[in-house]
Amino acid sequence: MILNAIERAPDNPSGPPLVLLHGLLGQARNFGLVQRHLAHGRRVLALDLRNHGCSPHQAGMEYATLAQDVFETLTSMKASPCILLGHSMGGKVAMRLALDHPETVAGLIIVDIAPRQYLPRFRPVAQAMLRLDLSSITSRSQAADALSDVEADPRVRAFLTQGLEAVEDKSGRHLGWRIGLSNIARGLPDIEGWDSPPGASFNGPALFMAGALSPYIKAEDHRLITDLCPQAQLVTLPAAGHWVHADQPDQFVTAIETFIAGGGFSP
């Protein structure tokens, strides 16, 4: 599958391109400000994973499948080897691609996720999103309010409803999901999990970035990380939650630029 991509690049980019992968229910556009800051002297691509953003809808949310989509897209766009950054679910996709196609990945940046199974906390939210009566909802804010029983944080509810857009069909004009929500909901067991070829590891430069206020990377995960990526550096960004790039964009960009410079990736 060829994925939708947002590309930013100077006239004469140098060094390997930087590729950005979003998390569950995110989209390439979420990296907008960060992507602009990182695209000085370097080609930077942000991809919509399958069933997200403007990419095609298709069943199958296994990480091997998602990684293959990214591989095919990077090959089509002549964007490998690359420095591959993934946030949350996108981080697991990035790790799997680095294991399956290590020649594609010059360096790996994983944001607030570890290579392990996570609890199924999102399943009730996905079901509530599927139950929304979009024929009677006229705005994203109204849809977000309707999800308050399953998600208390208004910022998270706004994030969950960013995949809604105005559509027009025989029943008239109303809101509809731009994303493949049913495919995502069915794929949650795969998204929550993690599988990799036995004994596989990525031996290139790697940075794992955690938010200090996020529970997603725990102390006991450090061994899992270094087993998978023996060269992994681990950094924690103060005052950042799970959405590290949104909470602390300046620190996020600085950490990436420091890693790239130290890894010999600089233009």
Regions found by a protein language model. Give the residues of each.
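Serine-hydrolase catalytic-loop signature spanning alpha/beta hydrolases and amidase-signature enzymes
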Residues: 25-33
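Alpha/beta-hydrolase fold catalytic core
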Residues: 1-19, 39-43, 79-80, 170, ...
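Active-site loop/oxyanion-hole signature of alpha/beta-hydrolase fold enzymes
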Residues: 6-12, 32-39, 45-86, 254
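Flexible "cap/lid" loop of the alpha/beta hydrolase fold
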Residues: 95-99, 106-139
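Active-site glycine-rich loops that stabilize anionic/oxyanionic intermediates
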Residues: 23-26, 88
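Conserved alpha/beta-hydrolase catalytic His-Asp/Glu region
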Residues: 135-196
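Conserved serine/cysteine hydrolase catalytic core
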Residues: 169-228, 233-236
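Catalytic histidine-centered segment of alpha/beta-hydrolase-like enzymes
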Residues: 240-253
